[in-house]
C-alpha cells in the first residue's frame, strides 16, 4: 500500500528544491523545507494534495476545477509541468504509480 502522505511530502520537497520561488505562493512561504511537516499551513496543503490524488486514482478528480482555482493564483501550465516532473520523482522514490496522466488532465484545462 502506498503512503500518499510520504509521496506528497517528497513531492513538495522536490518541487521547492527545484523551484524555490514556488514556495512563496503558499501560506507557508519562508518555512525551511525540513520544518514543513510541523507547519499547520503546510499540513493543510499536503492534506488537500493527498485528497486530490485519492480522487484522481478513483476517477473522480475535478481537473477543470483545480485548474480554474489556480488561474486566480497566477499558476498555469508551466508550473504544473514542473510539478509533474517533481511528482514523478516523488512517486518513483516511494513505490507509487505514476500520476502524470492526472497532472496532464489539469494542464489540459489551462
Swiss-Prot record:
Positions of heme binding: 70
Keyword rRNA-binding among UniProt keywords: no
MF terms (GO), sorted A to Z: heme binding; metal ion binding; oxygen binding; oxygen carrier activity
Superkingdom: Eukaryota
CDD domains given in the database record: Mb-like (cd01040)
Keywords attached to this entry: Heme, Iron, Metal-binding, Oxygen transport, Transport
InterPro entries: Globin (IPR000971), Globin-like_sf (IPR009050), Globin/Proto (IPR012292), Mb-like_M (IPR044399)
Start and end residues of each Globin domain: 2-110
Keyword Metal-binding on entry: yes
Gene3D superfamilies: Globins (1.10.490.10)
Protein family: Belongs to the globin family.
Subunit structure comment from the entry: Homotetramer.
Name this polypeptide is given: Body wall hemoglobin
Protein species of origin: Cerebratulus lacteus (Milky ribbon worm)
Amino acid at each position: 500500500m502506498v503512503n500518499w502522505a510520504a509521496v506528497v511530502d517528497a513531492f513538495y520537497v522536490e518541487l521547492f528544491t527545484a523551484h524555490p520561488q514556488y514556495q512563496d505562493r503558499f501560506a507557508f512561504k519562508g518555512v525551511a523545507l525540513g520544518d514543513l511537516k510541523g507547519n499547520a499551513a503546510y499540513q493543510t496543503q499536503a492534506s488537500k494534495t493527498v485528497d486530490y490524488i485519492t480522487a484522481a486514482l478513483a476517477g473522480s478528480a475535478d481537473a477543470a476545477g483545480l485548474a480554474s482555482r489556480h488561474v486566480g493564483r497566477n499558476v498555469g501550465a508551466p508550473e504544473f509541468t514542473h510539478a509533474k516532473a517533481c511528482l514523478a520523482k516523488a512517486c518513483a522514490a516511494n513505490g507509487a504509480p505514476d500520476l502524470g496522466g492526472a497532472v496532464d488532465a489539469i494542464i489540459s484545462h489551462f
